[in-house]
């Protein structure tokens, strides 16, 4: 039975989802931080000892392999201060996470349509970490580049979110302007995926309400689905019961358990700005 049969709801498959009108934007403000130049910070790759030719990774999907070695994640300390950069590959090796305490900056996008339904994705089966788990709209990393290191009002992270929504879901930049993302908070968590890979992230939680056209990239996304609040609760129950092998990503589950329902209230009321807390880093 396919993963889609786990839902007693219509499934949005990998085709265009045409929705036209845009929704009202949310403004936000929080403590400004200074920008950082990528030239000033160390590259930690010399300390990792990982080679791209590692035969143990010969079976890795070609697209995912390229991203693992080409993408440079932003290394931070537990106060979210940038301390360097390293490859996506090195940042997700559990041996580096445990031995070197490598922590990288990340973001999680929660996109709602004008009916206040949340767009979820099931990660592709070729993903290196957490394949085929269901998660929020888009989860990725700002890269070690000038446009994504801008810290004032989390602009670098918002730029990265716009980039990855196009990469993963085919959502064009015009449909998700960077000014309409509302960063609500940050959380720090660690989660192993298997014996080799895992996550150790300082995750920015970004909310946006827009009606968008979705064209998922099969290299990144297996399926997508909009869910209401009640439908999400049923999904969580199925995951807890282990029905049909359904799994949720650990970061998504942390947000669901700690923040999502109260923030969903603000989505429906149009009061997201009242929920913003970018001073606290929640260690979960």
Curated annotation (Swiss-Prot):
Catalytic residues in the record: 139, 201
Source organism, top-level taxon: Eukaryota
Pfam families registered for this protein in UniProt: NUDIX
Catalytic activity: isopentenyl diphosphate = dimethylallyl diphosphate
Motif annotated as Nudix box, chain positions: 140-170
One function term, GO molecular function aspect: isopentenyl-diphosphate delta-isomerase activity
PROSITE patterns to which the protein is assigned, alphabetical: NUDIX
Residues annotated to bind substrate: 88, 123, 127, 140
Cofactor note: Binds 1 Mg(2+) ion per subunit.
GO cellular component, one term: cytosol
Keywords: Acetylation, Chlorophyll biosynthesis, Chloroplast, Isomerase, Isoprene biosynthesis, Magnesium, Metal-binding, Photosynthesis, Plastid, Transit peptide
Residues the record lists as binding Mg(2+): 92, 104, 199, 201
Residue span(s) of domain Nudix hydrolase: 102-254
Transmembrane regions: none
Role this protein plays: Catalyzes the 1,3-allylic rearrangement of the homoallylic substrate isopentenyl (IPP) to its highly electrophilic allylic isomer, dimethylallyl diphosphate (DMAPP).
Name recorded for this polypeptide: Isopentenyl-diphosphate Delta-isomerase II, chloroplastic
Organism: Arabidopsis thaliana
Gene designation per UniProt: IPP2
């Amino acid at each position: 039975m396919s993963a889609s049969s786990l839902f007693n709801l219509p499934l949005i498959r990998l085709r265009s989802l045409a929705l036209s009108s845009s929704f009202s934007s949310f403004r936000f403000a929080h403590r400004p931080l200074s920008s950082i130049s990528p030239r000033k910070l160390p590259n930690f790759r010399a300390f990792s000892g990982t080679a791209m030719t590692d035969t143990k990774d010969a079976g890795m999907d070609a697209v995912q392999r390229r991203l693992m070695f080409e993408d440079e994640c932003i290394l931070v300390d537990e106060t979210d201060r940038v301390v360097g950069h390293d490859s996506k590959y090195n940042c997700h090796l559990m041996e580096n996470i445990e031995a070197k305490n490598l922590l990288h900056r990340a973001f999680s996008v929660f996109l709602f349509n004008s009916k206040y339904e949340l767009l979820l994705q099931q990660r592709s089966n070729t993903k290196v970490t957490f394949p085929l788990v269901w998660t929020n709209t888009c989860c990725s990393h700002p890269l070690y580049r000038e446009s994504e290191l801008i810290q004032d009002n989390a602009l670098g992270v918002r730029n990265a979110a716009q980039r990855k929504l196009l990469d993963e879901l085919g959502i064009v930049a015009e449909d998700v302007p960077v000014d309409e993302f509302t960063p609500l908070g940050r959380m720090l968590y660690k989660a192993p995926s298997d014996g080799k890979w895992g996550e150790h992230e300082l995750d920015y939680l970004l909310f946006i309400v827009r009606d968008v056209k979705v064209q998922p990239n099969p290299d990144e996304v297996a399926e997508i689905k909009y869910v209401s609040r009640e439908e999400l609760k049923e999904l969580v129950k199925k995951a807890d019961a282990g029905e049909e092998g359904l799994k949720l990503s650990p970061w998504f589950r942390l947000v669901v358990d700690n923040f999502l329902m109260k923030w969903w209230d603000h989505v429906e009321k149009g009061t997201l700005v009242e929920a913003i807390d970018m001073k606290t880093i929640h260690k979960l």
